């Protein structure tokens, strides 16, 4: 063997080991960059020395020419289906049949239990350790030749990881697409105006049956082995579980959830455990496969028709069903998001009766090409809200009606706007819309907004539920009699709440802007808006170009602000707030280049009386300062409010400049 051949063999062996660690053990020993480096090194050597290229090289997963069609492969050992059980009673009957048939009955019966993967069954033949042929299950006797496509699946070894491979070994398993890969695939398809897949199983099937293996290579497919067909030149373990572990040891991936269970009760416990974990597995399963573990007992039990007597699929309740779309209603969420909800002919899916399903947004309606009256496929997985995943367009009736997305909010009649680049359309009546009322009011009274002590979430809930308030302005119209009629609201608590409301009328423009709850407008942005426009009227009248002159206000935020002020309902509520006495003094802040704090480290301590701590922090950051939470020798200034404690003492000890709140305000305002 030449030095080049030795180098090639060593590279291939190393890369196969890394692939095994990554795809089978899920425990890579090297970073991806090291694998990539060796892979490219191998590829370059093979290009220089094509006479030494082998079909089982890690570089040869992709590269076959597109096929004109699939040839047929006859299975030497038929790929049988399984009988199904749909209840504990049916499973127990299966166990009873086994017990009645066995001459010497072991106590207890041991089962190898596996999740039933929702993918496609395949057969992969290795000759002297090299992947030689792969086929679909087909009708059990004959399948399609998918060798070129199977070679592209990253966790399928092209050569078995053993120095003593069997002469012939047929691995049987399921090819599927994990949820994460499925979502990436559909996202890419949407971005490139390509057809999307209804579910991961369809995506896996479509990918495996691609005539062009280069396309299959870009699909995130995975194999999990579940058994062995042909085995020549090897002494196999005597139990099903040990055979799967042996497959894993030679590089074939198996499912990590496989478990040995003794007796029917343990098996049923496994079934329920997997059912509970179903939504968090990261891939689709539709039940469990339960097999007698002892191979000798399997052989004794034998087969009936097209199924083994020693195994059964205990299926979960169906997750997908067909039903009719009777109507579509548009709901308004607490943040103003408009969600189309399908009203369905009730249908039993995954253990519950489903009559509603989400349609997500306008894009989804368009993608599905769905109309009222259509026959639709409903899917319910775990605790996930039922959704429509497909439409049987060939069943569309002549009287089907198109779904029209509303232009005005179905709750408050405010305009509905969809910002470019966003999937969700929203009601613009944030201060007025009843659907958004509770959240808008809770935000309005919060500490960082109007800071109304004594008026918390529970009180807001009561006031809204009893229809005593509808907008933030109504808070300032409350009286003692109204409040004392509420649950857990005595005279003292009511007086405190009213005093807090009265005190809150004196605020700052920045706090007021933040309290309005304009989407994407946080504390710092509100402060920037107040400093830039100086008055509420100037902000209200600003156009998009003027809004984008404000620091940290880009196109999206500018759109949010502009749309808010163009909705008449919002303007009416703001005017009502001013009429109720909400006011502020104009405080004009110096530009960053003119102030003392640019590029300085500042610590805030104690209670500030004229603004909140976060407001002061945002203001300092706007002026170019770094705000720290602790005092050190690197601190330039400490701003001390009332009841300043250890930070003030440490600043004095380190001879750091200390400013009172009044001195701080004098430094930053003109």
From Swiss-Prot:
Cofactors that this protein relies on: Mg(2+); Mn(2+)
Single annotated GO MF: metal ion binding
Annotated active site: 116 (n6-amp-lysine intermediate)
Catalytic activity reported: NAD(+) + (deoxyribonucleotide)n-3'-hydroxyl + 5'-phospho-(deoxyribonucleotide)m = (deoxyribonucleotide)n+m + AMP + beta-nicotinamide D-nucleotide
BRCT domain residues: 592-670
Amino-acid positions noted as binding Zn(2+) in the UniProt annotation, renumbered to this chain: 409, 412, 427, 433
Domain of life of the native organism: Bacteria
GO BP field: DNA repair; DNA replication
Positions contributing to NAD(+) binding: 32-36, 81-82, 114, 137, 174, 291, 315
Keyword 4Fe-4S listed: no
PROSITE patterns for this protein: BRCT, DNA_LIGASE_N1, DNA_LIGASE_N2
Keyword annotations of the record: DNA damage, DNA repair, DNA replication, Ligase, Magnesium, Manganese, Metal-binding, NAD, Zinc
Entry similarity comment: Belongs to the NAD-dependent DNA ligase family. LigA subfamily.
Protein name: DNA ligase
Gene: ligA
